[in-house]
Amino acid sequence: MKKMTKVLTTVLVIALAALTLAGCARKDTSPVTTDGSTSMEKVIGTLGEAFTEKEGINVTYNPTGSGSGIQAVSEGRCDIGLSSRALKDDEKATLTGTVVALDGIAMIVNPENPVSDLTVEQIADIYTGKITNWSEVGGNDAEIVLIGREAGSGTRDGFESITGTEDACQYRQELTSTGDVITTVSQNPDAIGYASLAALKDTVKALTVGGVAPTEETVKDGSYVIQRPFVLVTRTGETLSANAQKFFDFALSAEAAQYITTAGAVPVNG
């Protein structure tokens, strides 16, 4: 009888071990895929690292620009699209946008440029060609070189909407990423550009706009007027994968606010 009991106990232990191993094997660690805004790189990167450390699930990021990210999620090529502009009415028919943070769009010049402040009206006049020389706004006698983003960029959409310059900007160069804009302006003493506050580097100088500097505080209180949302885009009426839903919920949690702040943006929760 004792021998039989010992055999049954051994069988039970083996069975429980097998169930435990099977349970571990069933844990879904498939990555969460994101695609879109290049301005959101630091925010998504910081959130992704924190989420991976917490859950053991990787978050991938494809920096294609807001328009491409919206298209990618619409076509089912990623779990979550990333946009640095609000969804347009036609996009809202099949997609849902959820604001995760706010971001200032900084007006940037080369550090050698003596100009330190512009009004929104002056910025609009510069980008539409009414003001063409830096001397007209207190700078050097030099032609202003206009740097901007490509069509479909959320940063461009936000900038042009706020300054009222849609379809009127006379860009010298239209670049495909925030990083390219910053690099180009840093290398040209006569250039002006716009870039995400969250992505700024000390290789360029951020101007005050109407006397207000672009900071987390001025974006949050609304006194810095050139700002836009960072948006998580999902397909309306479709359920996210379990892992994508976990990341989505984490990104919107009070816990995530510290990581968004670290990345240079302004959290809407927490």
Where would I find each of the regions flagged by the language model?
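Bacterial N-terminal signal peptides that target proteins for export
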Residues: 1-11
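Exported/periplasmic ABC-transporter solute-binding proteins
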Residues: 25-78, 82-270
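C-terminal motif of bacterial Sec signal peptides marking the signal peptidase cleavage site
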Residues: 19-23
